[in-house]
Amino acid sequence: MSAARADRLVELLAERELDSLLVTNLLNVRYLTGFTGTNGACIVSRDERLFFTDFRYVEQARDQVPDFERIQAGADMLRDVAKRLRGRAGFDDDHLSVASFTKVSETVPDGVELVPAGGLVEGLRAVKDDGEVAAMAAAAELSTGAYDSLRERGLAGRTEREVAVGLVRFMEDAGAEGPSFPPVVASGAHGALPHAVPRDVEIPRDTLVVIDMGAMVDGYCSDCTRTLATGSPPDDALELYELVRRAQQEALPAATAGAECRAVDRVARDIIDAAGHEEHFGHGLGHGVGLHVHEAPRLGKTAEGTLEAGNAVTVEPGVYLPGSVGVRIEDLVIVTGGEPRILTGFPKELVTVG
């Protein structure tokens, strides 16, 4: 698998007239090599596949990185890597710090030209293969199970933080490597903060609760948001919920191969804007998910590009009324040539959990 990915990267290098690419971002390194450790880098060129790590990971790399020449680096690994660059050498400028770039530029052999080439590996990562989709589907199933567990345990009377900790424990007990991000559990007015941090505050009855969470399986993430009810929320909160649900329902089938990313966003945004909430939907409709919970492509008002079959994206409209209430509904989907495949299975009709 890693050999095929490196081969595709070499094709991109030829299109950019690059002789090689220095990859330092650990998720990109993992995608290309299979390495899961915390210190590694690689160089990919037409003639070489070089992987560098330190003493701690030599044995691990022997098992995980069969398709690259493995090199044990010294105390200053980046300088050891830089010495092996040749010709027009691209580097992932989205991730390499100024200090690290300075070190590389001071060390490369004479005649090497360093060329910013960020986004090349991320572009490959954006289109998932069957194995990646399977891992993400498994992760999504775990988060669906965590939502189901709330039907039994309820929400009212428990603190937001208690619920968040319980959701993580459920997913890990069910086989997750861990959460793909710290869960959001936000009740009432706290739900108007899109990335609210769970508080040591009891969740009241007769309110809406925004819960955003995901699991990680084989390094791949899921991401799902549901807004749940305790008791009988007020009518205006229920109307807001139905607005967001309708916006998401209309946007989902628009997420198809060939669709402009900004056009998919527009489907949901037009519905929310028409209801008078233009100022209350301030984030994009969605984002890619994979080895990281936020990656390419992006669905938003100014997003560039079009969707491709195999993209894994979220579709997550939300409306947030400061000091009052928030609603977000999010699914993780796989883009196809027709209707997207929805990985997140918990119901979207308003669920009351007590």
For the regions a language model picked out, list residue spans one by one:
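Active-site neighborhoods and metal-handling regions in enzymes and metal-associated proteins
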Residues: 1-354
